[in-house]
Amino acid sequence: MSIQTTADSRMIQSIFQVVLVSLLVLGSVRWILDELKSKESRISKLYGFRQKEAVFVTKEDQLDESCNVFEGQWVWDNVSYPLYTEKSCPYLVKQTTCQRNGRPDSYYQNWRWKPSSCDLPRFNALKLLDVLRNKRLMFIGDSVQRSTFESMVCMVQSVIPEKKKSFHRIPPMKIFKAEEYNASIEYYWAPFIVESISDHATNHTVHKRLVKLDAIEKHSKSWEGVDVLVFESYVWWMHQPKINATYGDTSEVREYNVTTAYKMALETWAKWFKTKINSEKQKVFFTSMSPTHLWSWEWNPGSDGTCYDELYPIDKRSYWGTGSNQEIMKIVGDVLSRVGENVTFLNITQLSEYRKDGHTTVYGERRGKLLTKEQRADPKNYGDCIHWCLPGVPDTWNEILYAYLLRSHRNFF
């Protein structure tokens, strides 16, 4: 009887211990969950957003190191493209909305860039937003770069609830925010990268240009600490073979050969890069020149037109027009090679050279206004073969940027 009582007592004691441990474990788990919930609540109250659930980036999403995404061809794809439409994206400016402005065809929207040795990962807005979680992505440059910024905003904005996104204009910047990710996509107007008299975002002189080749501080204050920086500067340099500029004493204005001035400006940028960029925390990209298609005789010998009314890409492999300055290309390559591996060169020039069909031509703006009926009838004088329609070619530049961002991304769960 005594032995049985002792056994029962031990069993009860064991059960009690198991129950007690279970309660302690459950209590600890509950406390941790409550703390996490409380922390999220505090973050939500402080920043006005709730963190969006993470999306997993797989190995299949990431480019192989050996893949050259800049060599390939344009293939027709009217199933997967465009990635968005003019109607679906309220952030496009009139300069790029060619369909809305009267362009009769939409073929330019349905070409997909296919690298020769690999495939670009299919663009996924949720995955990009997860890569940009708690980060800032900033595009810096001229109006071509502004189109790249607008393209990227249009590519991601449709997956974000209306009340969880915002768009702010704070000259010389534009800022798109995805609140659930605490992420922003931004644009900074700096057509020469270094300082100039054309730095006002809207009221800038086009013909009288004066560049301060050794001055970058005014701009760079807005770049410091940004997680992903994408630089571009070309078209504004190419208005004339020579350009007025200063170096040192701002009262001494000299006339420089454009390529000489460009090199001096880029070296000023490189000095800033080496002293201010934290390569462990920041990613920096530099985009090559966006080509122009001003003279049709370059791809169609004997003709005397422009890019107006062009419907298809150039199919001549390695085509290179006179609008893309080879010396500037070499300067960029030399300066970036001295900066080292901490900057990624987005060499979009060759793939964009083929796209004579993608420009706004007479379906854009001139000096802030849409072309008149009379001006549209004169594409040789009024057609814009510099800027691009959206959706269009800049979307591909962003798909390539997306591929590079995915390649370096590490999941944290």
From Swiss-Prot:
GO terms for molecular function: xylan O-acetyltransferase activity. A motif (DCXHWCLPGXXDXWN motif) lies at residues 384-398. The chain crosses the membrane at residues 12-34. Keywords: Membrane, Signal-anchor, Transmembrane, Transmembrane helix. It comes from the Eukaryota. It is a single-pass type II membrane protein. A motif (GDS motif) lies at residues 141-143. One of its GO terms (biological process) is xylan biosynthetic process. It is found in: Membrane. Signal peptide: none annotated. GO terms for cellular component: Golgi apparatus; membrane. Contains 2 motifs that are conserved in esterases, but it is unlikely that this protein belongs to the catalytically active pectin esterases. May act as a bridging protein that binds pectin and other cell wall polysaccharides. Probably involved in maintaining esterification of pectins. May be involved in the specific O-acetylation of cell wall polymers. Belongs to the PC-esterase family. TBL subfamily. This is Protein trichome birefringence-like 31. The gene is TBL31.
